[in-house]
From Swiss-Prot:
Induction of synthesis: Expressed in the late phase of the viral replicative cycle.
An example molecular function term from Gene Ontology annotations: DNA binding
Record's keyword terms, sorted: Host-virus interaction, Hydrolase, Inhibition of host innate immune response by virus, Inhibition of host interferon signaling pathway by virus, Interferon antiviral system evasion, Late protein, Viral immunoevasion
Record function comment: Plays a role in the inhibition of type I interferon signaling pathway. Mechanistically, specifically interacts with 2',3'-cGAMP and cleaves it via its phosphodiesterase activity. In turn, prevents 2',3'-cGAMP interaction with host ER-resident STING1 leading to inhibition of downstream signaling pathway and type I interferon production.
Polar residues compositional bias, start-end: 319-328
Source organism of the structure: African swine fever virus (strain Badajoz 1971 Vero-adapted) (Ba71V)
One Pfam family matching this protein: ERCC4
Enzyme class: hydrolase
One Gene Ontology biological process: double-strand break repair via break-induced replication
Impact noted for substituting N79A: Complete loss of ability to inhibit host IFN signaling
Name of the featured protein: ERCC4 domain-containing protein EP364R
Domain of life (superkingdom): Viruses
UniProt family annotation: Belongs to the asfivirus EP364R family.
Ranges for region Disordered: 319-352
């Protein structure tokens, strides 16, 4: 049996991993009955792909551009020696995930380090140390890449890439929330599973409730994000346009045209047909918004992954779902309810503090 061990400090990726592992278990192509995700304290790398009983197949370190730049400055870049030592003992493969927007300007400064220097360091990891370097966009993308690696190592899949690449409703709603400046994939996921946009713009999410929102590491949301959410609940037109532009097939220009004369709440309180008949002025003609776009707007602005949203604020049925969209994802799979907060208390550590165990591991 194969399993993935995640370091308990990976708060930003673990929520995505729980969902992705849940989805993987329901993939008919995956023959293993259980796709195990274990959350423990690691001292080498951030993730280990393992095979029962004690074989380490791969060790993965995840760094954002800022982390990578900081490690170059303070010498923590040399911590790769721990990974190299683990490979020598177990014959496992080594991976570096570098997380951030693709291909910034080489002269761009990241934490006072030029991106060109980060590229050079990444090249050295591949050429000199024979460490695979994989670039990812954000936490959600890192989780997807981890699952793809798990697929490949498990050798239980006919193909490495999941059979369907169509984004789920949850992923589309996370992207919608992330269209607001300052909202990361992690915060977007929390919002997508806590309330709908309709819930927020109608004022049903109070300032007190917004103030109580927490990140996976139990920290309050950034003040900028909380101020922005409160501003949306009070009808900030500019932020409403940004949110609406996050709906599939609705860009900023079209969102601004839709909200030219009315607030977002006005359309959410109207039948879909009312929204479908909005006149959109183009260069050479005027067209209607249309039912497909109108249904998508109503569906995604009312979408919420939480089962605790009340009926009056989440009155969406499967019948109202746009036919062109994929089926909604199931609720977040609870691989380990208390894993993040109690990992160090309930799980034995893996790493150099228990190196005697690692040294007994079979070679991959």
């Amino acid at each position: 049996m194969y399993f993935l061990v995640a370091d308990h400090r990976e708060h930003h990726v673990i929520p995505f991993l729980k969902t992705d592992f849940h989805d993987m278990q329901h993939n008919p192509m995956f023959t293993q009955k259980q796709a195990l995700l274990e959350i423990k304290q690691l001292f080498t790398g951030d993730y280990l792909i393992c095979k029962s009983p004690t074989t380490i197949l791969a060790c993965i370190e995840r760094k954002t551009y800022k982390d990578f730049a900081a490690s170059l400055k303070d010498g923590r870049y040399k911590n790769r020696q721990k990974m190299l030592s683990l490979r020598e003992q177990t014959n496992c493969q080594l991976y570096f995930f570098v997380e951030g927007p693709a291909f910034p300007n080489p002269q761009k400064k990241i934490n006072h380090v030029a991106y060109a220097s980060i590229i050079t360091a990444m090249t050295h990891l591949m050429v000199r140390d024979h460490i695979f370097v994989i670039q990812t966009k954000n936490e959600a993308h890192s989780s997807q890449k981890l699952v793809q690696l798990f697929y490949a190592f498990s050798k239980e899949m006919v193909c490495v890439v999941p059979t369907s690449l169509t984004p789920t409703d949850e992923e589309l709603c996370i992207k919608l929330w992330s269209s607001l400046s300052g909202i990361s994939g992690v915060i977007g996921k929390i919002l997508a599973n806590t309330c709908s946009v309709a819930h927020l713009v109608s004022g049903k999410l109070s300032s007190q409730n917004i103030d109580q929102l927490k990140t996976p590491s139990n920290r309050p949301f950034p003040k900028k994000v909380k101020r922005m959410l409160i501003s949306i609940s009070k009808g900030n037109k500019e932020l409403e346009i940004k949110l609406l532009s996050g709906v599939p097939n609705i860009g900023k220009k079209l969102a601004a045209e839709i909200l030219k004369d009315h607030a977002l709440l006005f359309f959410l309180n109207q039948p879909v047909e009312c929204l479908a008949n909005i006149q959109i002025v183009q260069k050479t003609r005027t067209i209607k918004l249309g039912m497909k776009r109108a249904e998508a707007i109503h569906y995604f602005l009312n979408w919420c992954g939480s089962a605790h949203v009340t009926d009056d604020s989440q009155n969406i049925t499967e019948a109202s779902r746009p036919a062109t969209q994929p089926a909604a994802t199931q609720p977040l799979h609870e691989v380990s309810d208390d894993a993040t907060s109690n990992a160090s208390d309930t799980s034995s550590p893996i790493g150099h503090q228990t190196l005697s165990k690692e040294m007994l591991l079979n070679t991959a």
